[in-house]
Structure formats: C-alpha cells, structure tokens
A protein has these predicted regions:
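Conserved beta-strand termini and adjacent loop/short-helix elements that scaffold enzyme active sites
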Residues: 6-7, 23, 161
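Short, well-ordered alpha-helix to beta-strand connector turns
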Residues: 1, 29-30, 155
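Conserved flavin/dinucleotide-binding core of flavoenzymes
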Residues: 93-186
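Mid-domain catalytic core of redox enzymes
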Residues: 10-136
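A conserved beta-strand/loop element that lines the FAD pocket in flavoprotein oxidoreductases
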Residues: 1-9
C-alpha cells in the first residue's frame, strides 16, 4: 500500500519478489504493475528484457495542446449543432472541442469547453488553463503492440496497464487494469 509519487525510483526484479528502490529505502512486493505510458517504463525499468523493450516500443505518443476555456468560437456557429464531441478541420487547424456541460452534466450557467489539437487563437480572458498532454498515437504498430502485450504480462512478476492498450479513453485504462487484476488473481 505504499504510494510513491515524484520520486527517484529504480526497480529490481527477482524470481520471487520485486523491489522498488527509493533512494536508500527498498520496498518489497509480490508483483509490479506499470500503470503509465509504455514510453515511461524504460525510465523506471533498467533490467527490461529485449522482448519487453520491443513490444513497449510499438506504442508511440504525441503531444497535444489542451485548452480549458469558455470561448464558444471553437464550437459550431449554431448552438443547435453542438454535441459532446465536436471535430473541426478548418484551413490549417485540426482540433476537437468537448462541450463539458453536456458531456459531464455540469451545473453551470457558463458553457465550459476542453479543446485539444491545433486550434486557432482564442481570447485569453476566456481561458482557464493551458495544458500539454501526451496522448497515444494510434497506428498499425499500436494494434500490434496491443496484441503482443499479453505475451509479457506477468513475466518477471511485471504487468502493464493503460489506456493505450485499447482506444485511449480513461475507461480503457480502467478496463486494462481490471484485466491485469484478473491475471494476477488467476
């Protein structure tokens, strides 16, 4: 039940146990679950097998600019056309705007949006927050990685979960975690 956040960690896997080392402290576990991007595993796992490296390298990521705002200029002109997800390809811009009031049933008099991708400039006074996220980049390699990941689940007492193992939604991260729990519990 140890949660270690923002720490300088290293991992040592042995036949019967896994050790997570944090500076001079060692935590012993029966198994290790990586609930992170596949690209982040290599930073933590310094004894990865060539099979693990090969499979995890199939998952690629892209940086997305994300905007939390209340500027309706990034939505369809007619409000009757607004939906929870609104996709746009306009000139050099390619973005998605989520209407959070509808998607999350927000109780707000103000319309709130999350926009990601390459979007036009907006009125800064209507911006709550700008964020950069790494999202899975889907390709044939990703689909191959999703198939092959099963072959390394549990090897060296190590398991992998994440939204990248399906369609990339938060729910997919939960789904893959439940699958790992079922494998661990037999």
């Amino acid at each position: 039940n140890n949660v270690i956040k923002n720490a300088n960690l290293s991992i040592k896997r042995e036949k019967e146990k896994v050790f997570v080392l944090n500076n001079e402290k060692a935590y012993q576990y029966d198994a290790l679950v990586f609930a992170c991007h596949a690209s982040q595993v290599g930073e933590l796992l310094n004894d990865s097998s060539s099979e693990e490296e090969e499979i995890l390298s199939l998952f690629e990521y892209t940086t997305n600019n994300v905007l939390l705002h209340h500027d309706s200029s990034l939505m369809p002109n007619e409000k009757s056309l607004w939906s929870s997800w609104n996709s746009f390809k306009k000139n050099k811009y390619d973005y998605v705007s989520y209407w959070m009031n509808n998607l999350q049933k927000l109780d707000s008099k103000r319309d709130i949006f999350v926009t990601l991708g390459n979007y036009p400039d907006v009125d800064e006074e209507r911006v709550f927050k700008k964020i950069k996220y790494e999202h899975p980049l889907y390709s044939e390699k990703t689909i191959e990685g999703q198939k092959l990941i099963r072959s390394i689940q549990g090897k060296n007492r190590t398991y992998f979960t994440g939204a990248h193992l399906s369609y990339g939604f938060h729910e997919d991260g939960i789904k893959s975690s439940v699958e790992v729990i079922k494998i661990i519990n037999g």
